[in-house]
C-alpha cells in the first residue's frame, strides 16, 4: 500500500522564473498538504517523488516527501546530484543554477522494508545506493523526470544496475504526459 509520484510532481516547468512563481514553502504547499491527507484517508504510504521547495538565499530544494498511513511525515530527502549537462541538439540543463544539493543519504524504516530515497540524476551515482544498502535498505526509490534523450539510453540499464549491485528492489516512477514546451 504505497504510491509514488515522479520527480517534480506539480511543478515540471522550464525556467527559473516560472518555477519560482509557482512554488511555496512545504507548510504552505497544496501538493504536500494533499499528499498527507490522501495518505491518511486511504491508510497508505504516499511518496511525493519530489517537488520544488524554496530555501533561504534564493535557491530551491528538489525535495521528496514520504508520508505514512496516519498522514504524518516520515522523512524528506533533498536530491544530492544536480543535472548539469549539455546534450546533443542544443539541449542544456543547469540544475545547480536554481537548486541547492542535499547533503545526506536517507533510509526510512517502514513496516514492509527499509527504503532508500533518491531522485532522478542520483541514479548515476552508485555510491549513494551502496550507502543506503549498507544502512539496511532493501528497497531503493528513484522517482525521475529523466530527459527523453538520456532516458532512452540509460534509464532501464541504470535502474537494473542499482538493483543488482545492492541486492535490492528498485521503484522508479517516471514522468508522463506533455511538457509546457510540447515535448
List the predicted regions and their residue ranges.
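Short, intrinsically disordered, charge-balanced linker/junction segments flanking boundaries
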Residues: 1, 163, 179-183
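Active-site beta-strand/loop signature of hydrolases that rely on acidic residues for catalysis
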Residues: 1-22, 39, 46-47, 122, ...
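Histidine/acidic-residue-rich catalytic or RNA/ligand-binding cores of hydrolases
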Residues: 14, 153-154, 158, 180-183
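Active-site catalytic loop in hydrolytic enzyme cores
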Residues: 25-27, 37, 55-135, 148-161
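An acidic, glycine-rich surface segment that forms the CoA-thioester-binding/catalytic face
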Residues: 27-44
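Glycine-rich, charge-decorated loop segments at or immediately adjacent to ligand/cofactor-binding or catalytic sites
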Residues: 40, 56, 180-183
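Short beta-strand-to-loop element that shapes/binds the nucleotide-sugar donor at the catalytic cleft/hinge
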Residues: 50-53
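C-terminal beta-strand edge segments of enzyme domains
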Residues: 169, 174-183
